[in-house]
Amino acid sequence: MQNINIRENGLTVEFGIREDGIVELLDFTAEDVANAKTTPTDPEAIFPVVEVQVTGKTTRHMHAYKHNAGSASLDFRYDTHSLKETANGKELVLQMKTGYGLEAAYHMQFFNGIPVVRTWTVLTNAGTGNIGLEYVSSFIYQGVSGNGGQSYYKKTEIYVPNNSWSDEAQWNKHAASDLNLTGMETDGFNCPGFGMNRFWYGSNSSWSTCEYLPMGYAQDTETGEM
């Protein structure tokens, strides 16, 4: 496996390029904490850096309402990458291609002086036929609360910023298990070791912050990471 390692503004970021060309985000942690690389127990488990659902394509496994199992995600293979300086800080761009004309550019923008990134994905149809898209991820990482010895659903707290008119930024703390983010005790034997459920919040229409602010964070109560 080829690796892309970046240490920038207090962040440790590592991408892995598998022998088949699929790119995975292996590590995304603060420099001062132990390494929390994604280490799936199933050797056939693949965590692509971009999740895409193409109309007519199937899914890789059970996923319920989560958008992390589109079979088209495994069609994207590494092409090139660049790390360039911008006015705000360094920007990584990973270029990936499929065999049917759909191409992806995964961007990770670092910011000078703070351990924060902004990520987004640009898809381009370089082929001759129409391609239907149902969703594309902007950021996906399998290693949240990956340090320590406890399972994520037993130690993760999720902070949600409720919002309203003249009642802004009302942060609320929830245990992962209280949000139905539980795990499976069995990992293997056709069981993935993690639950099928998602936790979602957001807004629509012209008032983007009507009920929630577009932010949030998770804390690992075992290690103190946020």
Predicted regions and their residues:
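Polysaccharide-binding surfaces and accessory modules of carbohydrate-active proteins
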Residues: 4-226
